[in-house]
Amino acid sequence: MKTVIQDTADVYFKRKSDGKLVFTAEAQTASFSQAISEEKLRGGIGNKPLYILKSEKEINLTVKNAFFDLEWLAMTQGETIQEETKVKVFDREHGLIVDDTNKVTLKGKPVSDVTFYNKKGLTYKIAVSTDGTYTIPTAFAAAKDKLTAVYQIEKVGRRLAIKASKFSERYEVEYRTIAYNPDTEEVYSDIYIQFPNVSPSGEFEMSLENGNALAPEIKFEALADTDTDEMAVVIEASRDENTAAPVEDTTGSTQSSDLGGTTE
């Protein structure tokens, strides 16, 4: 059946070890490519080509998403995201004005030593104060001077560890896109492409750049199922069995758009 596919795909990732499911409906691209090893068998006078030896079939998947999702990075690491975890992160305060007693007060709550920067770029490090007020040496900054403070604070968030000894696990992957009837331009069927046994690539890049949205990309390599020998399955499922199928020309003739007639 001839149809038109013009969209990307929804993508489902299911971890084989525990069934954890990751889903995206914001994929920018969902592709797969096949490559095989081909070698010519030659013989006879002139060493002419007699046969092509085919082997080593490979299928590689690439999914690029519009949104960042920590689950994607977790897939490349073989690690589980820890929820509601206390972590220490850096914070800073700008424009802190030294008062007449040569003190400054921080709004945040440091959990580590505080480092102050003056207008000359010099630094002054001091232990955490219980009341948030810090006395600044007059040799470092005078009254009315502006300082910047850098320190660590405690937050609660989702934590993903990247360990040297852990690697990605096996997944099942399914693409789902839609196909259109070229005669009516209505949605005719759903196209499913299933990969029952894939391994995510450990390669992952996060490039943070001004003005450009981070579009994470993850790659997989399909492996053969040990029972069925299948690496992938493509399924076309009609949305409605009563939906009119695209009209196919079985006469071998072509219609003339200029004359409205038939040209043999």
From Swiss-Prot:
TM annotation in the entry: none
Keywords for the protein's UniProt record, in alphabetical order: Host-virus interaction, Viral genome ejection through host cell envelope, Viral penetration into host cytoplasm, Viral tail protein, Viral tail tube protein, Virion, Virus entry into host cell
Keyword presence, Phosphoprotein: no
Region described as Disordered: 237-264
Any single GO BP term: symbiont entry into host cell
Gene Ontology cellular component annotations, sorted alphabetically: virus tail, tube
Ranges of biased composition (kind: Polar residues): 250-264
Quaternary assembly: Interacts (via N-terminus) as a monomer with Bacillus subtilis defense protein DSR2 (via C-terminus) in a 4:4 DSR2-Tube assembly; this interaction induces a conformation change of the tube protein and activates the NADase activity of DSR2 and leads to an abortive infection.
Name this protein carries in UniProt: Tail tube protein
Highest classification ranks of the organism: Viruses, Duplodnaviria, Heunggongvirae, Uroviricota, Caudoviricetes
